[in-house]
Amino acid sequence: MAGEERPERIVVSVRLRPVNAREAERGDGSDWECAGPTTLTFRGAVPERAMFPASYSYDRVFSHECGTRQVYDEGARQVAMSVLSGINASIFAYGQTSSGKTYTMVGITEYSMSDIYDYIEKHPEREFILKFSAMEIYNEAVRDLLSSDATPLRLLDDPEKGTVVEKLTEETLRDKGHLLELLAVCEAQRQIGETAMNEASSRSHQILRMTVESSAKQFLGKGNSSTLIACVNFVDLAGSERASQTASAGMRLKEGSHINRSLLTLGKVIRQLSKGRNGHIPYRDSKLTRILQSSLGGNARTAIICTMSPAHCHIEQSRNTLLFANCAKDVVTNAQVNVVMSDKALVKHLQREIARLENELKFPASASCTSHAEILREKDELIKNLEEQLKELMEQKDTVQSQLDNFRKVASDGDINNHLARRWSRSSDSIPRIVSEGAFSSSDTQDIDYQDQTMDELSVPHSFPPSSQISDITEEHEAQRVAHRAESEPPEEHCKEVQCIETNKLRSRRSQEFFQTPEKKTHTDDQKHSESMSNSAENAIKLYACDFEPSFDLEKPETEESLALKRCVVSSRDSALTRSRSCRASFMVIPNSWFDDSASTTPSSETFRYSTRRPEKVRKSLSPDEIADKSTGNAEEDKSTCNAEEETAVNDIGCVTEVKQKTEMNHAPQSSEQHQPKIAKEVATVSLSKWHIDFERKQQEIIELWHDCNVSIVHRTYFFLLFKGDQTDSIYMEVEHRRLSFIKNSLIADGELHATTASSLRNLRHERDMLYRQMVRKLHLAEKERLYGKWGIDMSTKQRRLQLSRRIWTQTGMDHVRESAALVAKLVEHLEKGQAIREMFGLSFSFKPRRSFSWVGVYSRD
């Protein structure tokens, strides 16, 4: 069992030997010197374009004046002593032939063994078991140095221990003297030969391995019942050599070639490890690297001592040694404490592991939380989300409370109430009185949008302006009110849902409830009847424009003027869209430009009104037939409908104009009533022709936006075939046009057009491939030939189906669009037409907005 990993780098040291007698006789001086404890410098002149540096830095640099004891203490002792802590260790000696590798390793091995035994003597509380083994790699054959048998040994792969040497002798050490005897045997068994550069040159790689196993002598508790086991390797590598320098031949030449081959593999492994563990590491190309695999880049602490000759004749070999050292110092190893658990401790550990796995099986959700840190992170995210929700709710509460306080302040102002009472007292007895806050029923208050009112908004003018002036005043008033709400509301309030259309039954029921109010006493005045009629109507409409729902007290029979005023108010309520729970879409402000008439008397207003409490009810548009019917049926009572605008809501100012005209027309001749149906029909005809022109223009713009935004082919086909010009399609056409325009503009502004275009083109290619496959199943041979001729595809060409699929929906001409839609609808099972499908499909086009401040600007402009 291994403990926690300790990533660290290989400790690299460089040792310079002095110039020997043979080199001194040739007159070779020293080209290298130690500039400091960690820096080695080249003495000679370095060319300007040299491929090698002039100085090198390592963990430690030793000059020829430093002894082996100093080399061991400062470069290898810490690594060697880590074996007593249960960490594997390896010490290498690398360099060219005759550079002093064996001389260095003999001293380091003796010093390490001596320190290990000194440590054992100082810690009698623990029991140590030391085992020793030795091997050499001669001509790529592994031999046991503790055995007289020269038979090569095989290398085996163990899943737990890694690469092991089969039948390798392992001696249990009795004492330090026993160890020295075994070291002498190894020295005698090792292959040594004479060359031109060295009289006693090592011809093989020697590996001395000591395994240290320690455990407590007394049972100190269940937590201290484990055993530490680790090994330390002392590796004396054979030196690299050149045949021209060593003057080797025959057996020496063969030995040199094997040595150089194994050292070349070692250099490749070190170089690959220094770059990271991404590529293939050729451990198995040499037996040396295969045996020392864990020591080079695995579970071990490693120290490499590079020995080199300072003589000028060995300058190239010295640079190669330093290059190897540069790569070695970048290698990272993962040293671990090797712990062997006792049987009792192992059983307990396995029991805990079984309990943990059973708990994960019982509670799968807890399996993902593998640590306390992950649990805390999840809790922090949950707390953060709850805090954000709480903050939003508090902001909504404060906004509603502020609006409610303003409403109460306005409603409780005695001067305003008295002023309104005096104004209503001048009106006709037949005009219903608009009651104050106390007259609102519980059912009516559900649809009230509390608005911030000022004294100027509640003030009533003393003169009645013309209808054109009323239109201008109302437009300015609506613009100011929307701008004020856009500033006071948070951005999140703009992202509310559009309310859908409910049934006529619900609207008629609400209109009936509107008039079912308790009777109360009204203040009447018989004088100045016609003047008070205009002022009272103006007061009623101004209060209703502020989103207060009035209730009427009827004490006297209703006159014709009062009935007209009621119809005006009820028409405004009935035309509003109530909220539906069945369909939801993202909030988008739809303009009523498609329903605008050319009449200059019709005031412009917003289709959607913002509310800090909830979205305002959307006004329902009236079709030309409905306008004609209402004009025909109510010709005697409603003579101002010929100038009414086909908008999504019945305009409030239109009601004022209607009431005023009603009052004036009471004293006029009744001969003009017979012309009303004819005028209404003319208005409907003009509006219908204008609608078709707007529809064709809007449809062409949408087709071009489809082409620019690379919209799905199936989406284009469904939309084109579903919405063919009916006036009820106006809202869907406007939503689609705004959605595409917003996507195009926002992507260009954000700088994401390139990536999004690539994704859209890829999706279009997949759709065309789908159509290409559908042609085999949906089209007959004769039909395909007819389509090829129709689309201009030569019958002698290849892949005609693929050509046809690539030409669909590639142009914006209406003829091309119709043919493409018809073909796609035939290849793809088209949805059945129907009102429900049209509405649900149209509402699904709305684009989900991002909650950012850029949306506020979009809403404010609409």
Curated annotation (Swiss-Prot):
Residues 598-610 have a biased composition (Polar residues). GO terms for biological process: microtubule-based movement. Keywords: ATP-binding, Coiled coil, Microtubule, Motor protein, Nucleotide-binding. SMART domains: KISc. ATP binds at residues 95-102. One of its GO terms (molecular function) is microtubule motor activity. GO terms for cellular component: microtubule. This is Kinesin-like protein KIN-7J. It comes from Oryza sativa subsp. japonica (Rice). The lineage of its organism: Eukaryota, Viridiplantae, Streptophyta, Embryophyta, Tracheophyta.
